[in-house]
Amino acid sequence: MKDRLEQLKAKQLTQDDDTDEVEIAIDNTAFMDEFFSEIEETRLNIDKISEHVEEAKKLYSIILSAPIPEPKTKDDLEQLTTEIKKRANNVRNKLKSMEKHIEEDEVRSSADLRIRKSQHSVLSRKFVEVMTKYNEAQVDFRERSKGRIQRQLEITGKKTTDEELEEMLESGNPAIFTSGIIDSQISKQALSEIEGRHKDIVRLESSIKELHDMFMDIAMLVENQGEMLDNIELNVMHTVDHVEKARDETKRAMKYQGQARKKLIIIIVIVVVLLGILALIIGLSVGLK
């Protein structure tokens, strides 16, 4: 009876262990499902930002091609800029959160962790790529707007250098160059465009500054990942070198081994021949006696 009780207890313990393993597997599966859900959401956000960037580039072109752009076009651009910033912040926060969880689980090396690292790296690089394109579009728009201001100032008889123009933009006061413009119809139109372009640049620079810290944050993350990947690549290259070196050494060893074997066979043959000759001499000597 006592033995039977011990068997039942042992069986129960085994069942409990199995249950724990099932619970761990279920918990891990649920966690990875949640992780992939976040990955998909973040990827869609990045794709949406990419679409918005292309739309913004079109609006930049429209604004630059019109002497006095439509207010609606500028409003559309403002809404688009706000949407890009909102989505970009959301993506940045998601990536930072993923990075934190990965660092916390760094002590446990597992297939899941490698998958999470890989997915996080891919998304981070994609995000930086999209935001770099956006930054390039903004800088291009600023330079072309600045060029338009410079041309309009020339129309009014005021020639400015790039340094002087930058000074005006940094001061936020276009009156530095527009205060003495002659009161004529052409000058008024030029003045209106100068002031409008100046406002566009001021608004744009505000957006660039807001995105700068976030961009640098993610860019640094990707740079660190790049160093990690470079280290991995370097280790792989070293490993390949070691393998090639070992292969060459093995070939040389086999060659030397083959040569040594040939020498050994020759020596054996010579010894056998000598022994044969010696035996023949002894035999003849005995026969003569």
UniProtKB/Swiss-Prot annotation:
Compartments, record wording: Membrane
Cytoplasmic topological intervals: 1-263
Record-linked Pfam families: SNARE, Syntaxin
Membrane topology: Single-pass type IV membrane protein
GO CC field: apical plasma membrane; azurophil granule; cell-cell junction; dendrite; endomembrane system; glutamatergic synapse; growth cone; lamellipodium
GO molecular function, one term: SNARE binding
Tissue specificity remark: Heart, spleen, lung and kidney.
InterPro entries linked to this entry: SNARE, STX3_SNARE, Syntaxin, Syntaxin/epimorphin_CS, Syntaxin_N, T_SNARE_dom
Keywords from the UniProt entry: Coiled coil, Membrane, Neurotransmitter transport, Transmembrane, Transmembrane helix, Transport
Coiled-coil portions: 32-111
Transmembrane segments: 264-284
GO biological process, one term: long-term synaptic potentiation
Keyword Ion transport in record: no
Matching SUPFAM superfamilies: t-snare proteins
Extracellular side: 285-289
Stretches assigned to the t-SNARE coiled-coil homology domain: 191-253
Assembly mode: Interacts with REEP6. Interacts with PRPH2 in rod and cone photoreceptors. Interacts with ROM1. Interacts with SNAP25. Interacts with VAMP2.
Function: Potentially involved in docking of synaptic vesicles at presynaptic active zones. Apical receptor involved in membrane fusion of apical vesicles. Essential for survival of retinal photoreceetors.
Sequence similarity: Belongs to the syntaxin family.
Protein name according to UniProt: Syntaxin-3
Protein species of origin: Rattus norvegicus (Rat)
